[in-house]
Amino acid sequence: MGFLYLFKLDSDLKALLYGKMMFIETAVKNIALESILVNANSESIQDMYDKVVSGYNNAPTSATTEQKRKLQQNKLNLQNSIQSSLAYAYKKNNPKITHFYNNIGYSDVPVWALFEIMTMGDLGYLLSCLTYDVRDDISKRLSLNVSCDTDRQLIYKYIYTLKDLRNAIAHNAVVFDTRFRNIDPTSAMKQCLKLEIGLPYVNFKTIGDYIILMCYYMKLLKVSKTEIKAFIREFEKITDNYRQAVNPNVAAIVIHPDLASRMNILKNFL
């Protein structure tokens, strides 16, 4: 019987997280897109590469030759992956993309149309390739706490973190035990949430930390306190239902013992 309760816990979690994750993905995309269009002063993908993506020629003055080469390689990899995404979308007859290639009035796909076909992983990689100034601009538009993020890496590191969970939800993989986790959180990723929310520690080893990161993003994205609190209550209800249905020793393995206290800290932060 225990397996059935676990299956229900996992399905209920995915159902709860899906809509909120899609909202976060779309909202962050819109903020990043707006910043890129303003900073490149253009909607051309080529202008984006030239003006807001880091490469050998616009690397920081302090960069070594090796660092400049790495930035250039990342830029080429980005161009490669964007071309592949466009080619795939065209092959699949995606109207968001074919419209621009099959229409004499257009010479290329605009940046905003590219954003419509980007996955969360693509978004994370693009953010990681942007110049420091543009990453700084996006971080500030989002109101991320940059005091513990001198290199402005949080905007893409957190997207990569959420992307692992998002893909697990989309592919109906198991989420309750965070086996989808592909990242090793940096000290800035931990420090930012500890400082902002007042948590004793953060490690992304339990689903609670992902709930915390999603709530932090919802707050940054101006979601109402009422809506975020309702989301937390629903999460608590799902975990409580599981806890009541199984043997306490089993529940203690699946549900982290300090989950309740962490959720209270989170609610006080809101």
List the model feature ranges, each with a label.
Residues M1-L270:
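Long, contiguous internal "core" modules enriched in hydrophobic/ aromatic residues
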